[in-house]
Curated annotation (Swiss-Prot):
Protein name: Ethylene-responsive transcription factor RAP2-6
Pfam families for this protein: AP2 (PF00847)
DNA-binding region: 60-117
General function of this protein: Transcriptional activator involved in the regulation of plant development and tolerance to abiotic stresses. Binds to the GCC-box pathogenesis-related promoter element and the cis-element CE1 (coupling element 1). Involved in the regulation of gene expression in response to abiotic stresses, possibly through the abscisic acid (ABA) signaling pathway. Involved in resistance to the beet cyst nematode Heterodera schachtii in roots. May promote callose deposition at syncytia which may interfere with nutrient import into syncytia and inhibit the development of nematodes.
This protein's GO CC annotations: nucleus
Gene Ontology biological-process annotations: cellular response to heat; chloroplast organization; defense response; ethylene-activated signaling pathway; positive regulation of DNA-templated transcription; response to abscisic acid; response to cold; response to jasmonic acid
Start and end residues of each stretch annotated as Disordered: 1-20
Entries under InterPro entries matching the protein: AP2/ERF_dom (IPR001471), AP2/ERF_dom_sf (IPR036955), DNA-bd_dom_sf (IPR016177), ERF_plant (IPR044808)
Tissue: Expressed in petals, carpels and valves of immature siliques. Expressed at high levels in stems. Expressed in roots, rosette leaves, flowers and siliques.
Localisation per UniProt entry: Nucleus
Gene encoding the protein: RAP2-6
Gene Ontology MF terms: DNA binding; DNA-binding transcription factor activity
């Protein structure tokens, strides 16, 4: 062992045969050295590091993860049920993060930790205006046509029933008129 260290310290590359065999036969460890890198100084270092960092790691958003095939999935934990709520799969990480933010605001209100806290006020205004334009359009037109509350209620009475609503058939109407059996009364009383 001492002779091996002497060889290493003195710079000899080949140890003597006696030193190798007296220590026992061990596998030699191969050492690899990387070729020396050119020394980069100043702002070139930061630019190179920034460019390599931006290529390696996309920005991470709360509640968002990337699927192996490249799409972005968003989910949030429901604080009331202690379960995960699936928000969907999105083309971009930003879209998934915005879906998370909307759900976080719905679940936690003003205490929510958001990905885009600076957009809270503008999102609410845009969402409300979009909601009013799309879903409240029929009601708004009736309000415009009926200036007073009384005339509005009369306008609402004159509306046609919703398309797609099923009206009960004659047989179904008679079903509800049948008297209850003792079994029906027992079941109803156990739930009430």
């Amino acid at each position: 062992m001492v002779s091996m260290l002497t060889n290493v310290v003195s710079g000899e590359t080949e140890p003597s045969a006696s030193a190798t065999w007296t220590m026992g036969h061990k596998r030699e460890r191969e050492e690899f050295s990387l070729p020396p890198q050119p020394l980069i100084t100043g702002s070139a270092v930061t630019k190179e590091c920034e460019s390599s960092m931006s290529l390696e790691r996309p920005k991470k958003y709360r509640g968002v993860r990337q699927r192996p095939w490249g799409k972005w999935a968003a989910e949030i934990r429901d604080p009331h049920k202690a379960t995960r709520v699936w928000l969907g799969t999105f083309e971009t990480a930003e879209a998934a993060a915005r879906a998370y933010d909307a759900a976080a605001l719905r679940f936690r209100g003003s205490k929510a930790k958001l990905n885009f806290p600076e957009n809270v006020g503008t999102q609410t205004i845009q969402r409300n205006s979009h909601f009013l334009q799309n879903s409240m359009q029929p009601s708004l037109t009736y309000i415009d046509q009926c200036p007073t509350l009384l005339s509005y209620s009369r306008c609402m009475e004159q509306q046609q029933p919703l398309v797609g609503m099923l009206q009960p058939t004659e047989e179904e109407n008679h079903f509800f008129e049948k008297p209850w059996t003792e079994y029906d009364q027992y079941n109803y009383s156990s739930f009430g």
